């Protein structure tokens, strides 16, 4: 099995890259985010690899990090999610945002993925909510905020600040993570305007 490839970029396809490793060209399928982050033809690249062996083909999937590869594997444990859909999800949400979306049970963020309907998105955030933290870095403040939002016990300024950031065009996971951090910095009793200001500062980092 191939676990990692290191070589030079030969060329790109719609959803794959040809990686030249000592004269052998490997066709590696990647998420759109990974493809965008790779260098131009001739540049050096290292990809973590997931190898799929079928009766009629061998297919390689490449990732910028082991964490992205683990998400790829985990997503496919959900009913209705195959390799193509898993890559599409990772094209829409990087690992950190996906972890926060699941922690916040934000199915709308996952459903923005092409080919993922509301039912599949709900299965992803429901079935993976207890699995993702095993290897993903999820801010404890986000997890705590998730519980408060679920129980409708989050302070009004917090919910208003999240809504304000979402209205500014930020995704729910990013907005919630930023306000969770802002709330932790500002302490109890922080007003909406202060949380928004701190949240925007957090998002600009």
UniProtKB/Swiss-Prot annotation:
It holds the Pfam family RuvA_N. Residues 144-153 are annotated as: Flexible linker. This is Holliday junction branch migration complex subunit RuvA. The lineage of its organism: Bacteria, Pseudomonadati, Pseudomonadota, Alphaproteobacteria, Hyphomicrobiales. InterPro entries: DNA_helicase_Holl-junc_RuvA_I, Hlx-hairpin-Hlx_DNA-bd_motif, NA-bd_OB-fold, RuvA, RuvA_2-like, RuvA_C, RuvA_C_sf. Residues 1-64 are annotated as: Domain I. Residues 153-205 are annotated as: Domain III. Homotetramer. Forms an RuvA(8)-RuvB(12)-Holliday junction (HJ) complex. HJ DNA is sandwiched between 2 RuvA tetramers; dsDNA enters through RuvA and exits via RuvB. An RuvB hexamer assembles on each DNA strand where it exits the tetramer. Each RuvB hexamer is contacted by two RuvA subunits (via domain III) on 2 adjacent RuvB subunits; this complex drives branch migration. In the full resolvosome a probable DNA-RuvA(4)-RuvB(12)-RuvC(2) complex forms which resolves the HJ. Belongs to the RuvA family. Keywords: Cytoplasm, DNA damage, DNA recombination, DNA repair, DNA-binding. It comes from the Bacteria. Residues 65-143 are annotated as: Domain II. Has three domains with a flexible linker between the domains II and III and assumes an 'L' shape. Domain III is highly mobile and contacts RuvB. It is found in: Cytoplasm. GO terms for molecular function: ATP binding; four-way junction DNA binding; four-way junction helicase activity. One of its GO terms (cellular component) is Holliday junction helicase complex. The keyword DNA damage applies. SMART domains: HhH1. The RuvA-RuvB-RuvC complex processes Holliday junction (HJ) DNA during genetic recombination and DNA repair, while the RuvA-RuvB complex plays an important role in the rescue of blocked DNA replication forks via replication fork reversal (RFR). RuvA specifically binds to HJ cruciform DNA, conferring on it an open structure. The RuvB hexamer acts as an ATP-dependent pump, pulling dsDNA into and through the RuvAB complex. HJ branch migration allows RuvC to scan DNA until it finds its consensus sequence, where it cleaves and resolves the cruciform DNA. GO terms for biological process: DNA recombination; DNA repair. It comes from Rhodopseudomonas palustris (strain BisB18).
């Amino acid at each position: 099995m191939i676990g990692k490839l290191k070589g030079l970029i030969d060329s790109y396809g719609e959803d794959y890259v040809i990686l030249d490793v000592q004269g052998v060209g490997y066709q590696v399928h990647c998420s759109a985010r990974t493809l965008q982050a790779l260098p131009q033809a001739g540049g050096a690249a290292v990809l973590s690899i997931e190898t799929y062996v079928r009766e009629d083909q061998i297919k390689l999937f490449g990732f910028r990090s082991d964490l992205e590869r683990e998400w790829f594997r985990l997503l496919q444990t959900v009913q209705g999610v195959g390799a193509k859909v898993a890559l599409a999800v990772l094209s829409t949400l990087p690992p950190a945002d996906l972890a926060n979306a699941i922690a916040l049970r934000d199915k709308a963020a996952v459903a923005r993925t092409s080919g993922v309907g509301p039912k599949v998105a709900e299965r992803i955030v429901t079935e993976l909510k207890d699995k993702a933290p095993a290897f993903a870095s999820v801010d404890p403040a986000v997890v705590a905020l998730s519980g408060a939002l679920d129980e409708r016990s989050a302070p009004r300024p917090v919910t208003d600040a999240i809504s304000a950031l979402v209205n500014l065009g930020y995704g729910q996971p990013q907005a919630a993570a930023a306000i969770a951090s802002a709330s932790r910095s500002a302490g109890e009793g922080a007003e909406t305007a202060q949380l928004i200001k701190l949240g925007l500062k957090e998002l600009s980092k």
